[in-house]
Amino acid sequence: MASIVSVGFDQLEEELLTMADSSGRIAKAALYDGADFMADKLRAATENLQVEDRRRKRSKNVLDYEKEALLNGLTIEKFRDDRARDCVQTSITFHGYSDHETEDYPGGVPAIILARAIIAGTVFRVKNRFFPNAFNRNKKEAEMIMVKKAESEMQKILK
């Protein structure tokens, strides 16, 4: 009768169990590096917005207080464990308010609304997709950074 001899399965099982126990930490470390890289690229795209001193009809540029509010409000959200999808998530978004008070926003215009108005355009603003364009341009590189970080974390665990 034929027989099969397997060598090394106990070690493989032990390594897989170790990796499963550390998977959350590995994912968070990789996501942290990817989010940090993407936040730097999105900040650079925000810094590259052209500024004008006063509002012109149908301009693509932003006012100085708008750009300042966007730069001050760009943040990486707290990491969240999504148990339903079995993953770790974060987002890069705008928080805070501008110093410019309006009738609708006496405490200042929210930075997220400014960003949305710049990206989508309004009756007095030509749309400028600075944020989605920067994200799409750098998405693959951020994914590669996360893969490399995950691989290096796995190598540390297996040593």
Task: Please provide the spans of the model-predicted regions.
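Prokaryotic Sec-type signal peptides and long signal-anchor helices
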Residues: 13, 41, 83, 134-135, ...
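C-terminal or internal capping secondary-structure element at the end of a domain, subdomain, or sheet
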Residues: 134-159
